[in-house]
């Protein structure tokens, strides 16, 4: 969102972070400061003491797990993390095996992970996957959480979530997909962002299903001001 604002003409963009800065090499006119503490008219005062006048404020809450329609005994309560506790295989509610949560994790993998979760949940519902004993479920959750808590950087996080998704994949008949290629793509993508946050979108990757390499977009992202499908699909020599 911050980069979109910058791209389309904002003279300055200030990002207030909740816990840790993203730490990318921002272009001139963009910066990160500790989160917004209070507003006094048009003046924003941040937790680190920094203050400045602002024209617009965009509240980005991040992923918040909020299930007011569930009883407390069924409610997932967690911050945004790669392995929320009390979910066996990241899916099955530990205290009630008829309740399934999908997509609750902080994400590198997205739809391929969601698919594997859905396949796994389907097979539990259809009794194709037999859940282990309560003690084994507890041990499995604790082992995954312990691994997650030792992660120190994005590359380790990519490895962790790849292994988690592969674990789900191995338990069902999900169609063939190249997880090692996905792992490599994510790490390349992470390096591209670290190298230049303004140009990482200009890269091309191959499909982990077909192997087909996607064509590069005809216009660098920072110069592409028209997001219509007609312009996006246009061929330019």
What are these regions (language model features)?
Residues 1-134, 149-237:
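Flavin (primarily FAD) cofactor-binding/catalytic cores of flavoenzymes
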Residues 135-144:
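Post-kinase regulatory C-tail/linker adjacent to protein kinase catalytic domains
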